[in-house]
């Protein structure tokens, strides 16, 4: 975190500093051959991207900025320590680049953010980790088209996400050979509970970036709003297992979902049914059965899902109901874009209830 001190706080030039490492972090006179020509922002846009209150700035810049690639898992503890020290050094080189090359000499590491000797965070931010083989594996297709997959994972969701599929690979040696994954468009999505539960290990719940997801979809499930919800779901799952004296994989998904709803958490990301809506929990439960299905879309940076909660229900939207109660389909005559009245809806529900009783 940088802070504007209102005076020149330029640090001494770090050992081995090479401005070419960061030349095309933004549009400036030293940027000649950018790795990503279509993504060169102005320096003002770059620095304000992570602007915070109190004259502070988060520096988390993927475009030839302070990203640093390390495969820590393959290293010994001693090697990890050395690699992380160099990663810190690399960050300080980028800070110096901002100060010396771009003229932001009043910005320096905040002295009132982290109580560490070097003013850097306690731990590095990891974008990727080793991942488990879970009871289910969530991938890009489940986010793009949740209702057409063989696995009906949308029925088991315990968290939501709406960030693009964002991969930072240009600091990886050999990134030129990788596919272009830049902000692959997706709708917002729900994350299934089975991604937290290892397939072959009893009594363990996994969270953060080690859940059972594909490499590609990890580009969005890794985001902090998602992993915070994963932690909440993991806590609910563990508590229910202890309370009911059950194994982790024996706990009812619905019990976990109810615990999350009781805490005003989301199962599915409906933009038109906010948590303040009196029907919020009901719509979340209906969506989690698939009786009503959300409509996902991508609009520029915005990844969305809408339930059309304030729109008249169409006959074609009842397919999900007949998946759950197939016998009711024989009694239903409307099709396509024919509208469903309240009286017809009540009659249909009564017939289902009578048959169930």
Segments from the language model and where they lie:
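Generic serine detector
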Residues: 42, 76, 129, 188, ...
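Structured segments of extracytoplasmic/periplasmic soluble domains
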Residues: 1, 97-101, 241-244, 259-266, ...
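Flavin (FAD/FMN)-binding glycine-rich loop and adjacent Rossmann-like elements that form
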Residues: 1-259
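Short, flexible coil/linker elements and helix-boundary hinge sites characteristic
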Residues: 6, 16, 29, 103, ...
